[in-house]
Amino acid sequence: MPAVEKIGDNLRLRIFLQPKASKDHLIGLYDNALKISITAPPIDGQANAHLLKFLSKTFKVAKSQIILEKGELSRHKQILIPHPKSIPPVVANLLIETT
């Protein structure tokens, strides 16, 4: 499966998460996944909550609409973003490469 996949009007992302980073940032392709760094620690779901908040702002979608499909307790995650209003250049480039 590619790192970024368009399914109708939705996006499915395979993510490699780096918690406890110095800033929130979309890094790019890493090991066939989109690498994202976030500042939250991986304790009691803080990293997942922070990731969803970051993706919500980045893709301009309500946080409650973003679905964590796989990887709740892992650095490797699969996330579905319904009807993104904005697609960052890093993600758009990966989307173009996979189609």
Swiss-Prot record:
Highest rank taxon of the organism: Bacteria
InterPro entries, from UniProt?
DUF167 (IPR003746), YggU-like_sf (IPR036591)
Q: List the record's Gene Ontology CC terms alphabetically.
A: cytoplasm
User: One Pfam family of this protein, by short name?
Assistant: DUF167
SMART domains to which the protein is assigned, alphabetical: DUF167 (SM01152)
Q: Which family does it belong to?
A: Belongs to the UPF0235 family.
Q: Which HAMAP family match?
A: UPF0235 (MF_00634)
The name of this protein is: UPF0235 protein HSM_1819
Task: Cite the source lineage.
Answer: Bacteria, Pseudomonadati, Pseudomonadota, Gammaproteobacteria, Pasteurellales
